[in-house]
């Protein structure tokens, strides 16, 4: 009796593991197809060269955006704060905020 129940439990475990493996393989192959199609088709015609569009078929949907967008905005703001601290107030192009203000004031004076 014990060996029969052990055999049935082993068989059940094997079937469940196989089913989970198949589902995972199907999901992986579908996501692989989506990635290969997006690389084959190239950037969408509606986007500019500077803009990257990423389709998000999966993931949480929240009104007013998704968690991923909020997290990326937070990361970019942290990154810009870190860059401004580490570069002594200058931006990526090497121009300080003081020089930018001075240039914009000069442009306003010229326009007036």
Swiss-Prot record:
Its main location: secreted. Residues 36-47, 85-97 have a biased composition (Low complexity). InterPro entries: Svs4/5/6. The keyword Lipid biosynthesis does not apply. It comes from the Eukaryota. It is found in: Secreted, Extracellular space. This is Seminal vesicle secretory protein 4. The gene is Svs4.
